């Protein structure tokens, strides 16, 4: 009933769901009939651990589909060891630090997780993942192994860091480093894979700040959103350098009398996350294969929509919040072109700016940050260019023009999907009206 009410209140999202389910094209669908039993099982494990990631991964170009599936499962297995508090550190730390070495084997498994650990299956059946890992091209294996080594050691370092375990993250520098180990390293690996497949401009792997920002923007958004959940679990990821300006203890924001200070703290955290947006837009402009672009773009547009949701939202301090399913579908459909992504970012940035209030200590900083991003977006897609004037040639504008070759076919597909959706909904509307009219006449 709740979902039906949401659709009734947001009819545009109903159209998006119809378009997504019935008319969206997928030219890279898997064909399980041609796959080995081991490969099929790996995709089953992928769906068991994350249905949302599985859906996007399964639509990737065949060159990278299995590569990124294996990469995700390897890192999920690593994470499943790290988060399981039932595993003694004497066991956990060596496994984390040596996990990359297990990739050289073909039959290693691990059954030391708690029976209640929901993702333990990826470790119990890790030999199947290893089988598919060894089917990959050597250059892809090398990337996966390198990132696994860095992430495993990073996880172990944080477990052994008594200051972090006692006090959480203290400085913004600590915050950035933690987010890099959790998400920036993933961005590093994915970027290397995309460039190796020749699906992205080589600048992606040269300018490391771009892929770092991709990961940090996502992770910081999740950390802001998950405040209440982390507090309940006894975890602290908001940096004290920020929250210490507004409270004596991080948990104070859960008290009703501290709501205003909590919202101001969220405001500063949002400002900090928005500092990565220009890098994110530059990164997306350099991805030159459609399915890889979709894979990179979808999480980023979800992140900016989530930042708008958490901004000035007191519910973040007392409960878990998330964007509506219909909104998610709309964002997936709109983000299939670079111009669509730019439009989404502009829309949500303006919503954030509109919700900001002069009483917020971060009001001026927020306005300046959003203004810089809007100026960058104008450089990508100038709103108004007087007749006879040629837009200024910049590196981002040059890349945008180059990407038009990729975006134009997708724009045509999107227009076709929208037309079919409207025809279907109009036909259904006419049919329903006819039935109602007939019933009324009989009565």
Swiss-Prot record:
Coiled coil region boundaries: none
EC number of the protein: 2.5.1.21
One Gene Ontology CC term in the entry: endoplasmic reticulum membrane
Signal peptide: none
Gene Ontology molecular functions: squalene synthase [NAD(P)H] activity
Predominant location category: endoplasmic reticulum
Pfam families in the cross-refs: SQS_PSY
SUPFAM superfamilies: Terpenoid synthases (SSF48576)
Pathway assigned to this chain's UniProt record: Terpene metabolism; lanosterol biosynthesis; lanosterol from farnesyl diphosphate: step 1/3
Keyword Transmembrane helix: yes
BP term (GO), one: ergosterol biosynthetic process
Cellular location(s): Endoplasmic reticulum membrane
InterPro entries named among the record's database cross-references: Isoprenoid_synthase_dom_sf, Squ/phyt_synthse, Squal_synth-like, Squalene/phytoene_synthase_CS, Trans_IPPS_euk-type, Trans_IPPS_HH
TM region positions: 291-311, 423-443
Chain's role: Catalyzes the condensation of 2 two farnesyl pyrophosphate moieties to form squalene. It is the first committed enzyme of the sterol biosynthesis pathway. Required for the biosynthesis of ergosterol.
Family: Belongs to the phytoene/squalene synthase family.
The protein's name: Squalene synthase
Origin species: Cyberlindnera jadinii
């Amino acid at each position: 009933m709740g979902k039906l009410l949401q659709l009734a209140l947001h009819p545009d999202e109903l159209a998006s769901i119809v378009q997504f389910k019935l008319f969206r094209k997928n030219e890279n669908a898997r064909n399980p009939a041609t796959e080995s039993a081991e490969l099929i099982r790996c995709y089953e494990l992928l769906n068991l651990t994350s249905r949302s990631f599985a859906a996007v991964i399964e639509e990737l170009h065949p060159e990278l589909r299995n590569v990124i599936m294996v990469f995700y499962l390897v890192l999920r297995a690593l994470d499943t060891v790290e988060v399981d508090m039932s595993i003694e550190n004497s066991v956990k730390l060596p496994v984390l630090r040596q996990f990359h070495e297990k990739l050289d084997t073909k039959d290693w498994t691990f059954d030391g997780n708690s029976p209640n650990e929901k993702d333990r299956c990826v470790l119990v059946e890790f030999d199947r993942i290893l089988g598919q890992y060894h089917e990959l091209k050597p250059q892809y294996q090398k990337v996966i192994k390198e990132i696994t080594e860095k992430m495993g050691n990073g996880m172990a370092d944080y477990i052994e860091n008594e200051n972090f375990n006692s006090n959480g993250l203290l400085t913004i520098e600590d915050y950035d480093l933690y987010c890099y180990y959790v998400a920036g390293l993933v961005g590093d690996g994915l970027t290397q894979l995309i460039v190796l497949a020749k699906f992205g401009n080589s600048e992606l792997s040269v300018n490391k700040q771009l892929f770092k920002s991709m990961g940090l923007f996502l992770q910081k958004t999740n950390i802001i959103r998950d405040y209440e959940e982390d507090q309940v679990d006894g975890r602290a990821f908001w940096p004290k350098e920020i929250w210490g300006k507004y409270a004596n203890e991080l948990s104070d924001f859960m008290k009703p009398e501290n709501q205003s200070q909590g919202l101001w703290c969220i405001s500063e955290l949002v400002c900090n996350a928005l500092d990565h947006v220009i890098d994110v837009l530059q990164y997306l402009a350099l991805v030159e294969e459609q399915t890889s672009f979709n894979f990179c773009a979808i999480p980023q547009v979800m992140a900016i929509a989530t930042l708008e949701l958490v901004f000035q939202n007191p519910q973040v301090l007392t409960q878990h919040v998330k964007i509506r399913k219909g909104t998610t579908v709309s964002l997936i459909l709109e983000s299939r072109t670079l111009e669509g992504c730019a439009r989404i970012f502009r829309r949500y940035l303006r919503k954030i700016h509109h919700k900001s209030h002069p009483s917020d200590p971060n009001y001026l900083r927020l306005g300046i940050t959003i203004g810089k991003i809007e100026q960058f977006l104008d450089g990508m897609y100038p709103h108004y260019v007087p007749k006879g004037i040629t837009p200024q040639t910049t590196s981002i504008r040059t890349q945008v023009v180059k990407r038009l070759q990729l975006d134009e076919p997708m724009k045509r597909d999107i227009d076709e999907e929208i037309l079919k959706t409207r025809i279907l909904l109009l036909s259904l509307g006419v049919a329903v009206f006819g039935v109602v009219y007939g019933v009324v006449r009989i009565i």
